[in-house]
Amino acid sequence: MNVVTHIHELKELIKQHQEKQHSIGFVPTMGFLHEGHLTLAKEARDQNDLVVMSIFVNPLQFGPNEDFESYPRDMERDQRLAKEAGVDILFTPDVKEMYANEPSITMTVRKRTDVLCGKKRPGHFDGVVTVLTKLFHLVAPTNAYFGLKDAQQVAVIDAMIKDFFFDLHLVSVPTVREEDGLAKSSRNVYLSDKERQEAPALYRALKKGQSAIENGERDVSRIYQLVEEDILQTSGEIDYIEIYSYPELEPLQQLAGQVIIAIAVKFSRARLIDNVIFHVPESGEKHV
């Protein structure tokens, strides 16, 4: 595995593989790798000649009161895990490498960001698409891999790829979970022992809401109540419970089509997000 920190090194390696017409799978991350990231890397390994992973904690996607400085980092461990997952090139730039000067041009996302996490984190997705635009130009991937735990991010990136005619395929991978259902996340390390025991309630609550809809419940207020019940028994504070069309992230006139139930819950030092995405048959549509 090649570990590179400078853009010129990365571009030279990518050029060598492009000349051989190799397919390139790209897994962008902020590091502190867990099984979710490694699943993305393994998918990329199975589907491409070359696998590139980036580790970059992007300051543009953190708000003024968020955890940029304290975001967990362990580069030595990350390098070992990336190598074991079959990564060929690990790109680990610092902030000065990616933003040599204060950016004179950044991206602005106009749709799909005024709900869910974007509602409480203004500018977050602008930072995400700005850094991804840079990374996509540098890596020139055939396929780029993202986890559906961050479903809003996947929806925004999907729109960005289409709007800017990036010649790449977005591969969205189902959320990787612990045995008790908790979505794997770098921020899970912030949970106390008690909070860690409570946290699986998020997924149980989401599945309860999904089950109710699949069994015919169409009263949205009742679905919210069902999802809320399990969370209220924890020490977490509900940030949001929302139901939208997916990937458009628009309010539903009726519960039909591709639907997302998404949730965010704040514990003492961790804000956890999770979701379920599923198809709801329209009236008269046959179940498959």
From Swiss-Prot:
Self-association state and partner proteins as the record states: Homodimer.
Purpose of the protein: Catalyzes the condensation of pantoate with beta-alanine in an ATP-dependent reaction via a pantoyl-adenylate intermediate.
InterPro entries: Cyt_trans-like, Pantoate_ligase, Pantoate_ligase_C, Rossmann-like_a/b/a_fold
Gene Ontology terms, MF aspect: ATP binding; pantoate-beta-alanine ligase activity
Residues reported to bind beta-alanine: 61
Gene3D superfamilies in the cross-refs: HUPs, Pantoate-beta-alanine ligase, C-terminal domain
The gene coding this protein: panC
PANTHER family found in the cross-reference section: CYTIDYLATE KINASE/PANTOATE-BETA-ALANINE LIGASE, PANTOATE--BETA-ALANINE LIGASE
Pathway(s) per entry: Cofactor biosynthesis; (R)-pantothenate biosynthesis; (R)-pantothenate from (R)-pantoate and beta-alanine: step 1/1
Record key words, sorted: ATP-binding, Cytoplasm, Ligase, Nucleotide-binding, Pantothenate biosynthesis
Major location category of this protein: cytoplasm
Taxonomic classification: Bacteria, Bacillati, Bacillota, Bacilli, Bacillales
Name the UniProt record assigns to this protein: Pantothenate synthetase
Annotated catalysed reactions: (R)-pantoate + beta-alanine + ATP = (R)-pantothenate + AMP + diphosphate + H(+)
Entry's family note: Belongs to the pantothenate synthetase family.
Binding site residues for ATP: 30-37, 147-150, 176, 184-187
Note: The reaction proceeds by a bi uni uni bi ping pong mechanism.
Alphabetical GO biological process terms: pantothenate biosynthetic process
Active site: 37
Record-listed E.C. numbers: 6.3.2.1
Residues in the signal sequence: none
